[in-house]
Amino acid sequence: MKISKKRRQELIRKIIHEKKISNQFQIVEELKKYGIKAVQPTVARDLKEIGAVKIMDESGNYVYKLLDETPVIDPWKELKRNFKSFVESIDRAGNLIVIKTIPGTASGIARVIDRLDIDEIVGTLAGDDTIFVAVRDPESCEKIVEKLSSIL
């Protein structure tokens, strides 16, 4: 069935709110139950537009949540849990921190690092299994590496 983008996004919001959705293909399948044919790239764009993000739930699984429904969790507590579960190594190169994670978890961990609101951290960039953390200067970088390494 052909529906408007607005209606499809409303359904995606409903699906995310009612079910634990861990990947975009699950949303494609759920939309089929409503008689709506959608492909993964369309769902990916919709998720971005409606502000859906993947966060770790209470069971340690990553699921989609809407930003306005995301519970406020102490970022240091969340980082500690994420680091112990998903970080493989931390290294330093000049004023960059390179964090290697298990595949598929880097963006979630980078988002938590951004929420730490550390003045010395300029920003993060995440791929599938690698995070670059840009730090203002090498001295601050060393202190942050020590603090992050102590969490592992």
From Swiss-Prot:
SUPFAM superfamilies per the UniProt record, alphabetical: C-terminal domain of arginine repressor, Winged helix' DNA-binding domain
Protein name: Arginine repressor
InterPro entries: Arg_repress (IPR001669), Arg_repress_C (IPR020899), Arg_repress_C_sf (IPR036251), Arg_repress_DNA-bd (IPR020900), WH-like_DNA-bd_sf (IPR036388), WH_DNA-bd_sf (IPR036390)
Record-level Gene Ontology MF annotations: arginine binding; cis-regulatory region sequence-specific DNA binding; DNA-binding transcription factor activity
GO BP annotations, alphabetical order: L-arginine biosynthetic process; protein complex oligomerization; regulation of arginine biosynthetic process; regulation of arginine metabolic process
Location in or out of the cell: Cytoplasm
Keywords of the record: Amino-acid biosynthesis, Arginine biosynthesis, Cytoplasm, DNA-binding, Repressor, Transcription, Transcription regulation
Protein function: Regulates arginine biosynthesis genes.
Protein family: Belongs to the ArgR family.
Pathway info: Amino-acid biosynthesis; L-arginine biosynthesis [regulation]
Superkingdom of origin: Bacteria
GO cellular component: cytoplasm; transcription regulator complex
